[in-house]
Design a protein with these regions (language model features):
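Post-His helix in hydrolase/transferase enzymes
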Residues: 233-248
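Active-site loop/oxyanion-hole signature of alpha/beta-hydrolase fold enzymes
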Residues: 37-76
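Conserved serine/cysteine hydrolase catalytic core
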Residues: 173-215
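Conserved loop-alpha-helix segment in the C-terminal half of the alpha/beta-hydrolase fold
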Residues: 28, 197-231, 237
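Gly/Ala-rich beta-loop-alpha elbow adjacent to hydrolase catalytic centers
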Residues: 79-87
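Flexible "cap/lid" loop of the alpha/beta hydrolase fold
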Residues: 92, 98-130
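Conserved alpha/beta-hydrolase catalytic His-Asp/Glu region
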Residues: 112-113, 133-191
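Conserved HGGG/HGGXW glycine-rich cap/lid loop of the alpha/beta-hydrolase fold
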Residues: 1-48
Length: 250
């Protein structure tokens, strides 16, 4: 999207998400200033029969694409949730160069293989039906979600819209691989790359521990504090989100 000679902005979706549901509303707001590239993860692309491998294998594929099509240099990358882990990995590995890396209120959770397996095995049966069918399999969970959406206003509805509709082509194994691999793939501490700024949209309602986590993994992160919930700026305030991205990357 956008002019071929414009600065490149790479958009990376969140956990088990499709690029269009995450970024469809903001691409038109960005395409006047950037050449916008959206990552479609293996296993979550309706045009392919693939499964998500691991975070590092997917990172290598992204790097290879950027080397081939962008000369290995882009203006900025924005990672929504899980996508922020990819931004961190791209910065730390230094196989491509970006002027700005932006993390969208990513949690950057990490766990031991055993703990990650337990978390994955517990959450996957709950999450996968939502990916495949667009709704929870357990009726009581769907009722609670519907009630929460009615009571909480725009955020839950907007967040569910960002998560996307039913995607029967996504396998449980892809979701499992993505969730588990994200937890066990280490992100180095005090990442510092000359010529690369790291910006983080810090959603304060997620909790104070994330400030310390961001400062643990990045040497000089620029925190953009917002009294919001996880990815609420992107989900509910796309115009403001696009304005902030432009103010950082242009």
């Amino acid at each position: 999207f956008g002019a071929e000679d414009a600065p490149v902005l790479l958009l990376l979706p969140g956990t088990c998400c499709h690029w269009k549901s995450n970024f469809g509303a903001v691409i038109p707001l960005l395409a006047d200033s950037f050449r916008v590239l959206c990552v479609s993860y293996d296993g979550f692309d309706e045009t392919e029969q693939t499964e998500f491998p691991t975070m590092l294998e997917e990172t290598e594929k992204i790097e290879a694409y950027l080397k081939t099509h962008c000369g290995g240099h882009i203006r900025a990358a924005y990672g929504c949730s899980l996508g922020g882990s990819f931004v961190g990995l791209l910065a730390a590995r230094q196989n491509i160069h970006m002027n700005c890396g932006i993390l969208g209120s990513s949690d950057l959770d990490q766990a031991s293989p055993l703990a990650a397996r337990l978390q994955t095995d517990f959450l996957l049966p709950l999450i996968y039906p939502v990916v495949r069918d667009g709704k929870f399999k357990a009726k009581f969970l769907q009722k609670r979600l519907d009630k929460s959406a009615r009571e909480s206003g725009d955020y839950v509805k907007a967040f569910l819209k960002m998560f996307g509709k039913a995607r029967p082509y996504v396998t449980m194994q892809s979701c499992k691989n993505q969730f588990y691999s994200d937890l066990i793939t280490p992100l180095p501490d005090k990442i510092h790359v000359p010529g690369t700024e790291i910006h983080i949209f810090y959603a304060l309602k997620m909790g104070a521990k994330y400030r310390a986590r961001y400062q643990q993994h990045f040497a000089h992160p620029v925190l953009h504090e917002q009294n919001l919930q996880h990815e609420e700026l992107l989900a509910c305030h796309p115009v403001q989100w696009a304005h902030l991205v432009k103010s950082i990357a242009l």
